[in-house]
Amino acid sequence: AWALTLGYMVFTLLNLGTLSFPTSVWTAQSGAAVRIDLGAEYDVAEIWTNGNIAEGSAVFTGDDGSTAEYTQKYATMFTWRTQTAAMHTRYITLQCTAGKVSLNEIAFFDAAGNRLPAVIAAGTTESAALLDEPNTVPDEPSYLNGMYFDEIYHARTAYEFLHTMSVYEWTHPPLGKILIMLGVVLFGMKPFGWRVVPALFGAAMLPVFFTLAKRLFRRRDLAFLAAALLALDTMHFTQTRIATVDVFILFFILLMVLFMTDYIQMDYMKEPLKKLFLPLGACGVSFGLGVASKWTGLYAGAGLAAMFFAHMIRAGISCRKDTAARREFWRRTWATVGFCCVFFLAIPALIYYLSYIPFFRYEATKPNGVGSIALVLQQQESMYHYHHDLTATHTCQSAWYEWPFTSRSVWFYFRSLGEKRVSSISSTGSPAVWWVSAVGAILLAVEALFRRTKKESAHWKQAGYILLIAIAANYLPWTLVPRCTFQYHFFTTFPFVVLAAILFLQHMEESGEVSGRVKWIWLSVAAAYFVLMYPAASGLPMPRLYAQFLEYVLPCGQLFFGAV
């Protein structure tokens, strides 16, 4: 498992994002201007800008009277934008015309694509930031050197947390953005910096998943199969290489289920309470961290409660005819309930409250800032109404019943590289993993719930119930959500679907109904599919013809939505 984790970590960090990115900032209010000298008269055909956090507009004006308008909005920060110009000039004046404009760097190009020399001719001391990092100007704008998809919310907010600014993204609890911020602290506000922590959490999932699978299957080969299938899933790859919070909630959910499984597999009546409380306490802390990252942790929490109470009831039934055992059961139960009140209620509430420290710090800078408890309550109300009242639609939205069969990807990024090449990132599950797992999970449910044969061990049945509860808890609530939803909302469910399919495969293999080679054939097909899909999952430039093959021939659903 560790070799797989190390190999995956190295692989996922490759081409994650650049460390060469402008960090000094020029900020101007309406009316402020700076004059730029190109050193000689040139024909300026293109202007590149890298924006910071601001909303406003500006105009580039050449000495020949020609202009190029620039508008800065929330979706245009921390990425390179190109705009055409038609200037024959030596001097260019950049003036903020409305609102506020904030730029990290600018560059000028002629029609042949040559970057033109430029220096500040007149302006404030701060205006030097516009041209002081020329080595950070890339050969071409791409996901490697700028934000894409929801990074404009989550990575931006990580920057705001770090600099005690007004917080833009408040529709999810803060912990995930705080974790993204740690990468920014270590590597700067650069694409690698805001993506590295999600990528490392994605790699760290593999040993957690391996350990959970080993607890459930009691076989290292099947545990390795589970971890390898997770590593080879295209959605896992894309979701853990982008600076959003989904990777964190899945990581903490896996920890929750792992620790609850450890607890359930211990003898409730024989093990010392201190030993029982170790995995139970770790589960509660993981639950708190999960909910502080995303509210969907509450769905998983409902599953934990179902597992916990089923285990307690089973233990109570086993000792109902023995007076002494029954007395001991209630002693343990009351102690456990008290422990759970601390670790599943008080500590998660404290973690959740403390995750709002960045909000508290910003409020403290205001003359009439909101108090901490009032602020947290206010944020919860705002979050609820945002998700409950959301009526927006999206090209990539899909219904919950479509997710297991990957019919509609979530299109993160696309750039046309001339007539023959494109670069794209589509977040979608691998049919080689998801389709097979969905069928296997259904067969497991039938076997566990309806057939009830005596061939399976008590441990196998227990593992089946754990997985079916985990699937139901993380998936079924989405059937009641009226707002538009996306395939990546299945991200917290599909690992348990994979485990359920492997558990059914174990049953078939150990009963002699299928060969032991089947699992390796499955893994080989998943690996081959990952190789085929890698360009569309990673942004690696590919021939347009190959993109058309992926879109129209390979059974992977909509990837590019007709763009190729």
Predicted regions, residues:
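Transmembrane helical bundles and short interhelical boundary loops of multi-pass, membrane-embedded
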Residues: 1, 10-36, 128, 142, ...
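Specific aromatic-rich, kink-prone transmembrane helix
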Residues: 208, 248-273, 285-287, 305, ...
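Aromatic-rich transmembrane-lumenal/periplasmic boundary elements in polytopic membrane proteins
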Residues: 113-158, 329, 348-406, 544-547, ...
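Transmembrane-helix signature of polytopic, membrane-embedded enzymes
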Residues: 204, 209-232, 250-251, 269-275
